[in-house]
C-alpha cells in the first residue's frame, strides 16, 4: 500500500449531500468503537447500512438507535470465531436477495488477543485472533466480491494498525494478523485493478475504544481522539468522493503514532 498524500482533506472530510445516496454499505464490528461511529455517520448521511456483529442483542439495540436517523439499516449477525462456509454463503445470499449489490465493505471487526511474548503466547488464542482478524475478512471478501462487482463504484476498506506495517514486541497475533490484512489489501488491489472495486487501508492510530483500553490500561482515554473524530477518512473512502482512489494506506494520525 502507498501512503496517502500528506494534505488533510480526507482527514476533515464532510460528506456532500449526495455522496451516499443509494449506496449499500456493510460495516463489520458495527456495534462498538470505530465501527459504530462509522455506521452511525453513514446512516445519517444517507447510506443504507448492513450492520454486522456477533451479539444479536447489541445489533438490535444499534438498529433501533439508527433507524430514525436515515435509511433503514439491516442487521447481519455472524460470529466470526465460529462461522463456517455455509453461514457466510447464507449471509451473501441474503444481501443479494435484498439489495442485489454491495457498494462498500468496511472490515473493522477484530479482537486483540494477549500482549505477550511469542515464546509464551497461547496457541489456541493465536489461532482465534488470526481467524477473526485475518481469515474471516478473507472469507467474507471472497463471498461478497460478486456483489461488489455488481456496483458501478465499489469500495473495499480494511481497518489496519501501525503494528501491521512494523511489528512490535508483545503485539503477537494481532500484529501478524494486521500485517496479513495489509498484504491481503495489496493483493486485492492488484487483482481488481481493472474492475470498479477499489481497495484501501485505514490506520486510525490510537483511539478511545475498549480495545485500546485493554492494550494500554494505564493510559487516560481522555488523551485519545474519539471514534467519531477518526470516522471522516472511512466515510471519504466508502463514498463517491474518493472514486478512483485505490491502493492507498491512510494514516489518520502520523504514520509513526503507536497503534
Q: What residue spans do the PLM features occupy?
A:
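Conserved glycine-rich cofactor-binding loop
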Residues: 31-32
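Alpha-helical segment proximal to the catalytic Tyr-Lys
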Residues: 146, 189-191
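C-terminal helical subdomain
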Residues: 4-10, 194-197, 201-202, 209, ...
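Rossmann-fold cofactor-recognition segment
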Residues: 68-84
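Residue(s) in the substrate-gating loop at a strand-loop-helix junction
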Residues: 161
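Substrate-binding pocket helix/loop in short-chain dehydrogenase/reductase
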Residues: 91, 116-118, 122-127
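Active-site helix of classical SDR
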Residues: 141, 177
